[in-house]
From Swiss-Prot:
Alphabetical keyword list: Cell membrane, Membrane, Transmembrane, Transmembrane helix
Main location: membrane
Gene that specifies this protein: ywzH
Highest taxon of the lineage: Bacteria
Origin species: Bacillus subtilis (strain 168)
Gene Ontology annotations for the cellular component aspect, listed alphabetically: plasma membrane
Localization in the cell: Cell membrane
Protein name in the entry: Uncharacterized membrane protein YwzH
Residue stretches spanning the membrane: 16-36
Claim: Transmembrane is one of the keywords in the record: yes
InterPro entries: DltX
Membrane topology annotation: Single-pass membrane protein
């Protein structure tokens, strides 16, 4: 089973798909952690100046 997975991962299309899916998952996790805010909804840090 492990040998089959290694053979599959050596194919460029499978490797590209795995890498793209991994980075897309990281991007989605970051979006959900920090939220989908527009530029006008965040707190403005220079209110007191």
């Amino acid at each position: 089973m492990l040998q089959l997975m290694k053979q599959l991962y050596e194919k460029p299309a499978v490797k590209w798909t795995c890498h793209t899916g991994f980075y897309l998952m990281i991007l989605l996790v970051l979006f959900f952690m920090y939220g989908f805010h527009t530029a006008n909804t965040g707190s403005y840090i220079y209110n007191d100046f």
